[in-house]
Structures are given as structure tokens and as C-alpha cells.
């Protein structure tokens, strides 16, 4: 895949992850509601936020891109799971925005991970 497209994907995923941090760390009511519903408030909210911060940072460095993409894939798979099991696709009348953002971020992180597969030490 084109290196420029992959760079744009990495930046896009990192921005998506980073922009959600203020909601998690500052205790936005929607974020508190989500993590209360799944039984992970407040420690899950802070923990997931911290993991998303690490994943977004790893995406910015070429050597660690695969780790950031792998973490993001796992984090978004968890978000998708909770949307499909406990939260529902639409949370607090958001029209499914959070769910669809999670699915899109998951798909893009899979593309990044696939493109970086040769850099993964335990696969190569």
C-alpha cells in the first residue's frame, strides 16, 4: 500500500484516539454513562484512556507502528463488543456515531497492522 496513505491512516487513527481522551480523563457524563453501563467506571475509563494514549503514541513511530495498530485493533474490538452486547449501537441518542467510529477505527487499524506485518518480530 502507498506509504502516504498509510501515514494518513496512522495520523487519522491517532487523532481519533487522542480526541476521545479528554472525555475519558475529565469524566464527561457520556463517558461515565458508558463505563458505568459496562461496569468499568471509573478505573476502566482511566485504564482504557491510558491504553489509547499509548497506542496513539506508538502509531507515530515507524518501529512501533505495528504495536500501536495491534493495540488499537484490540481496543476497538472491545468497544465494538460492548456496543453489540451491553450498550447498543446507539448510545444516548448519538445516532450510532461512537459505534461507527469504533468500527472505522478498527478497520483502518487492521489495514495498518496488515501493512506492518513484516515488522512484527514474532511473525517474521
Stretches found by the model and what they are:
Residues 27, 59, 90:
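Active-site-proximal flexible loops/turns
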Residues 1-20, 63-124:
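Extended, low-polarity transmembrane helix blocks
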Residues 3-48:
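N-terminal first-folded block
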Residues 48-50, 103:
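Short hydrophobic/aromatic segments of transmembrane alpha-helices and their interfaces
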Residues 40-41, 60-63:
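Membrane-interface junctions
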Residues 50-58:
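Hydrophobic, membrane-inserted alpha-helices
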